[in-house]
Design a protein with these regions (language model features):
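Bacterial N-terminal signal peptides
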Residues: 1-10
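Short amphipathic alpha-helical patches
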Residues: 7, 59-64, 132-133
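Mid-chain, structured segments of secreted extracytoplasmic proteins
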Residues: 58-103
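Generic secondary-structure boundary/loop-capping signal
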Residues: 4, 21-24, 82
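Non-cytosolic coordination micro-motifs
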Residues: 15-55, 89-194
């Protein structure tokens, strides 16, 4: 199902003022928290408590950005060791993860960066929380842009105490774009690696 949406997104139009190319012009890898807060002067919010992303943390978010007209929340992920900007993650709020948003975001990224260098698909399985996933990867210069689409299938309701009527008891859909430097965690130096 995700493959159909990814392939269908190729023909849609996108806005030229999308967040990804603009952010890449505005920020610098290794930049400090204070520098980000100054640069976005009031548009960025410092969180009362940091969000942990494993190898990084985010205590600054930027609201009001869009990709292909779809609103996203921007997380500036800071390196735990150096405390400098390590990665940028733009995430669609969970309640807004749907096929039109997926198509709009994919089309906008393809309008800005061309065809992905690689597309990876992850099939539904119990070990993956019954989530199907698709990932598009673009490598441009020293930057890697990765769009990740995850969706939960009906099998995810297996094991719920009261079945489907009890609502979600596991993972829900997720739609995010990660911007990273080549060679950093999760991104290899080989072009198009998922």
């Amino acid at each position: 199902l995700l493959l159909v949406f990814v392939l269908a997104a190729r023909g849609a139009a996108a806005s030229a003022a999308d967040a990804v190319p603009e952010l890449l012009k505005q920020v610098h890898w290794g930049e400090t928290l204070q520098s980000l807060l100054q640069q976005f002067d009031g548009a960025a919010t410092q969180l009362p408590r940091s969000l942990d992303f494993g190898d990084s943390y985010a205590d600054v978010v930027l609201h009001g950005e869009t990709i292909g007209g779809a609103p996203v929340v921007t997380f500036f992920q800071m390196d735990k060791r150096t405390r400098g900007l390590k990665r940028i993650q733009l995430e669609r709020p969970r309640r807004g993860v749907n096929p039109p948003a997926l198509r709009a975001i994919s089309a906008a990224l393809q309008a800005d960066y061309g065809r992905p260098d690689k597309i990876c698909l992850t099939p539904v399985s119990p070990i993956g929380g019954y989530q199907a996933a698709a990932q598009e990867v673009w490598v441009r210069g020293t930057d890697a842009i990765s769009a990740i689409y995850r969706d939960t299938t009906l099998q995810a309701f297996e094991g719920c105490l009261f079945g489907v009527a009890s609502g979600y008891c596991g993972l829900t859909g997720q739609l995010l774009v990660r911007i990273d430097r080549i060679g950093r965690f999760g991104i290899t130096t080989r072009v198009g690696e998922c």
